[in-house]
């Protein structure tokens, strides 16, 4: 609210080698438009959110071509892969904001780069929901055919491509716990439930 939407993130959200290759022209066009818009609008600060494959390139461009400070919310997961990107982050990002508490030790302890832990909105939402609905779990279990065992939730993502890529392997890996846990697929609100069935057939 209160902003001007130039591109929807769905136009940029491609995962995997083949989808990126097939949409490379669109990705490059959007990248060029984004860089041009930032320089034309000349904001007081540029706030980049997640999506490091795209946003770190934008940060590099803005740092090289303007004095605009670059803030990055949801820090790139360089502790998981491509740790060498810390050099680019140190060079191109003025302030880094994390939603994972352990990242403070990783960035500040290992790489001597200051980072702000700002809490995790998803975790806060889950905790609030649990407090408000603690007494309703029995009804939830009954409505969903759960038998009272601990729940193992499969969170395959919120984009169709990542669900197609991840869900079959997740189900296979989780199946070894079937006797000990209730396996529950947490569906993304923006994905038609039928899509999950098609992926798992």
Map each language-model feature to its residues:
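Conserved active-site and cofactor/substrate-binding residues in soluble primary-metabolism enzymes
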Residues: 135, 165-169, 194
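Conserved catalytic-core segment of nucleotide-activated headgroup transferases in glycan assembly
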Residues: 158-186
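Charged active-site motifs of nucleotide-sugar-dependent glycosyltransferases
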Residues: 146-153, 181-182
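Nucleotide-activated donor-binding/catalytic signature segment of Leloir-type glycosyltransferases, i.e.
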Residues: 197-201
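Short beta-strand segments at enzyme active-site cores
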Residues: 48, 152, 184-186
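Active-site and donor-binding regions of nucleotide-sugar-utilizing enzymes
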Residues: 1-141, 155-162, 177, 190-191
């Amino acid at each position: 609210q209160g902003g001007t939407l130039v591109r929807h993130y769905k136009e940029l959200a491609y995962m995997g080698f083949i989808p990126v290759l097939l949409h490379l022209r669109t990705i490059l066009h959007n990248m060029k438009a984004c860089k041009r818009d930032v320089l034309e609008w000349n904001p007081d600060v540029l706030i980049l959110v997640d999506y490091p494959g795209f946003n770190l390139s934008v940060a590099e461009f803005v740092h090289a071509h303007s004095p605009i400070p670059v803030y990055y919310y949801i820090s790139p997961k360089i502790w998981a892969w491509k740790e060498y990107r810390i050099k680019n982050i140190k060079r191109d990002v003025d302030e880094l904001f994390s939603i994972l508490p352990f990242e403070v030790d990783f960035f500040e302890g290992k790489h001597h780069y200051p980072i702000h832990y700002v809490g995790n909105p998803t975790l806060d939402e889950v905790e609030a929901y649990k407090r408000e609905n603690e007494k309703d779990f029995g009804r939830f279990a009954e409505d969903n055919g759960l038998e009272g065992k601990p729940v193992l939730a499969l969170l395959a993502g919120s984009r169709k491509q990542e669900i197609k890529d991840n869900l079959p392997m997740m189900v296979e890996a989780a199946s070894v716990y079937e006797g000990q846990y209730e396996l529950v697929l947490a569906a993304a609100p923006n994905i038609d439930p039928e899509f999950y069935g098609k992926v798992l057939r």
